[in-house]
């Protein structure tokens, strides 16, 4: 993971008691990543990075929450270029 910033969020204590701090942090990061992806602000890869998940794990979370993929021809071309560079 690259450089980043910490963001402080306030949650009621009972939520922290229910989920625990670690899970609450993971869920908050995931929900932010999903919303940024849904709005088209970040790519799939960047959203997965924000959520601290692999792309495969992030795709699973999108499917679990019925979030459609934002995949256009430009992203397809980028993926084709990356695969071409790997070969």
Swiss-Prot record:
Family of the protein in this entry: Belongs to the UPF0175 family.
A Pfam family recorded for this sequence: UPF0175
Source species, domain of life: Archaea
Record protein name field: UPF0175 protein AF_0597
């Amino acid at each position: 993971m690259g450089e980043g910033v910490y963001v402080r969020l306030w949650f009621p204590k009972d939520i922290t008691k229910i989920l625990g701090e670690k899970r609450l942090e993971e869920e908050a990061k995931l929900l932010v990543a999903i919303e940024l992806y849904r709005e088209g602000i970040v790519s799939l890869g960047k959203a997965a990075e924000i959520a601290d998940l692999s792309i495969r794990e992030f795709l699973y979370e999108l499917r679990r929450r019925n979030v459609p993929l934002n995949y256009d021809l430009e992203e397809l071309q980028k993926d084709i270029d990356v695969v071409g560079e790997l070969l």
